Design a protein with these regions (language model features):
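Short, small-residue-biased leader/transition segments that mark boundaries at the very start
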Residues: 1-5
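A short acidic, Gly/Pro-enriched loop at the edge of an enzyme's catalytic core
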Residues: 6-14
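A short SAM/SAH-binding and catalytic strip from SAM-dependent methyltransferases
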Residues: 13-25, 45
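A short glycine-rich, Lys/Arg-flanked "PGG" loop and its adjoining helix->strand segment in the class I
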Residues: 25-40
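ADP-ribose/adenylate-binding Rossmann-like module
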Residues: 38-51
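Conserved class I S-adenosyl-L-methionine
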Residues: 48-61
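Core SAM-dependent methyltransferase catalytic element
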Residues: 64-82
Length: 82
C-alpha cells in the first residue's frame, strides 16, 4: 500500500505518483480522498496502452483528466479534483 494511507485526514494540493498501472488503479481512491478540491494528481510509470484504464479509473474516483503526455511508449496523466 502507498504512503497515502498513512496520512489520513490530511489534504494536499498536489500528489505525484510514479508507479505501475495496477498500483495506481488500486490506490486511486486514496489519492482522490487525499486531494483537496482543485488539487492536481500527476501519474506516470505506465505504458501508453494503459492510458484509457487510468483515465476511466480517475473519472470513477471523481478526478477529471486534463492532460496526457506520451514518450517512448510511456505515459503521464494529469488529473484534477473537481
Amino acid at each position: 500500500a502507498s504512503d497515502v494511507y498513512k496520512r489520513q485526514g490530511r489534504k494536499y494540493d498536489f500528489i505525484a505518483a510514479n508507479i505501475n498501472r495496477n498500483i495506481l488503479t488500486m490506490d486511486m481512491p486514496a489519492y482522490a480522498e487525499a486531494l483537496d478540491t482543485g488539487g492536481d494528481l500527476l501519474m506516470s510509470g505506465f505504458l501508453e496502452e494503459d492510458v484509457p484504464v487510468i483515465e476511466a479509473r480517475a473519472r470513477a474516483c471523481g478526478l477529471d483528466p486534463i492532460e496526457v503526455r506520451m514518450r517512448d511508449g510511456w505515459a503521464m496523466v494529469h488529473v484534477k479534483k473537481a
